[in-house]
Regions:
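Flexible loop/turn connectors
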Residues: 5-6, 10-107
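ATP/NTP phosphate-donor binding region
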Residues: 2
Length: 107
């Protein structure tokens, strides 16, 4: 919440914030709610991970789902290949924007 306060104090015309994790975004949403900042009216908010906290906060948090289960599966496969001295290819994991109320009318 302190980071959100500092950001908004330094940049009062901010109209959107993308947080690197849902837990940080939820803290930011709490700060904005406590200080009368309208979400998404004044500021749109997006988190990252699509955790359960994204659905539980108010308003519900728009989040980027980074497909964590697939990331874990690929990581294990890569480690096993490395252990057996086999080449490892780069992998791209698709992400999905899960739109919820914190960006309503903005995206």
């Amino acid at each position: 919440m302190e980071a959100t306060r500092m950001l908004l104090d330094a940049n009062p015309k901010t109209d959107a914030i993308l947080y690197s994790a849902d837990v940080m975004a939820v803290g930011g949403v709490h700060y904005m709610n406590d200080h009368g900042i309208s979400i998404p009216g004044e500021i749109a908010v997006i988190g990252f991970n699509n955790s359960t906290s994204a659905c539980e906060c108010y308003p519900p948090l728009t989040s980027i789902d980074n497909n964590g289960e697939l990331c874990g599966q690929l990581a294990v496969q890569m480690m096993l290949r490395l252990i057996s001295h086999q080449p490892v290819d780069d992998e791209r994991v698709p992400c999905e924007l899960i739109k919820r109320a914190t960006t309503e009318g903005k995206l």
